[in-house]
């Protein structure tokens, strides 16, 4: 059965990890020009593939292989480097390729109820906050084989002391436990564009540390959110579909992302959606959770510096660690010796 609204494009944006459970976040654009964020597990993607093969046996190549148009769903190797998280990031790239190939197939597959039901936001996708302990890991783009001579991706600076926003646990460059507390002061030794900075604590332990957990980065991100908010309105998502009955009302599907321009205690808020401005019932709106994290890495949208302390209750986004070869290739020999890399130390995994 064909659905009136169908997905037209989608791309992977993040790996969301909680303990051993991994979900893959996608930004989905629909035929009515709306866009949503959804999270799906690897098993859910496998089940989608089985459903599509059963629903479209010809397109799956079950009758004639030459007629196959449905893409295959490959898996990441079991022995992927960097363990569970590394395998999740490999799967994220594979799923991105798979979904884009899937949405490039024939029109009747795009309009199928199976595909619509998979990508339509579920109640879990509409929650204003992620489960406690969740880590949102953003993939880094694939590095080119060669870069222009003289380009530096790691920037050194004099040691600067910055407090931590929240507690964080990792390993130092010698694989020893490295634990920090909220407001603990760390000395910044090197900054890397991947979001992992080289820091030193009061015990002279050196470790790679996620920059969003540091006060300077978090404050800057909060200020940027406030500036953007003044011009475009705070972003919310709809918890249910609404069909406008008057000319000054908007019609929106469930899970749509809207900008709230003006709130009111009368129960109707002025919003902008899909290029139109109109009223929506406040009871059908809630602050975006995943979308805010992915739209502004580190913290959700904020109305100003007064909300920074409140926003810190949400764990910052942890960027993907840079690989060992990327760091070594951009460090001079003096830096390598300082890090002890020539004695066999490495970036913790």
From Swiss-Prot:
Annotated spans, Proline-rich region: 315-324
Keywords assigned: Cell membrane, Lipid-binding, Membrane, Repeat, SH3 domain
Localization terms from the record: Cell membrane
Expression sites (tissue/organ): Strongly expressed by colon epithelial cells and to a lower extent in small intestine, uterus, stomach and testis. Expressed in different parts of the inner ear including sensory and nonsensory cell layers of the saccule, ampullae of the semicircular canals, the stria vascularis and the spiral glanglion neurons.
Domain SH3: start-end pairs: 160-219, 231-290
GO cellular component: NADPH oxidase complex; plasma membrane
One MF annotation (Gene Ontology) recorded for this entry: phosphatidylinositol binding
Keyword S-adenosyl-L-methionine found: no
Record-linked InterPro entries: NADPH_Oxidase/PX-Domain, NoxO1_SH3_2, PX_dom, PX_dom_sf, SH3-like_dom_sf, SH3_domain
Predominant cellular place of this UniProt entry's protein: membrane
One of the protein's GO biological processes: superoxide metabolic process
Record function comment: Constitutively potentiates the superoxide-generating activity of NOX1 and NOX3 and is required for the biogenesis of otoconia/otolith, which are crystalline structures of the inner ear involved in the perception of gravity. Isoform 3 is more potent than isoform 1 in activating NOX3. Together with NOXA1, may also substitute to NCF1/p47phox and NCF2/p67phox in supporting the phagocyte NOX2/gp91phox superoxide-generating activity.
Quaternary structure note: Interacts with NOX1, NOXA1 and NCF2/p67phox. Interacts with SH3PXD2A and SH3PXD2B. Interacts with CYBA/p22phox.
Protein name from the UniProt record: NADPH oxidase organizer 1
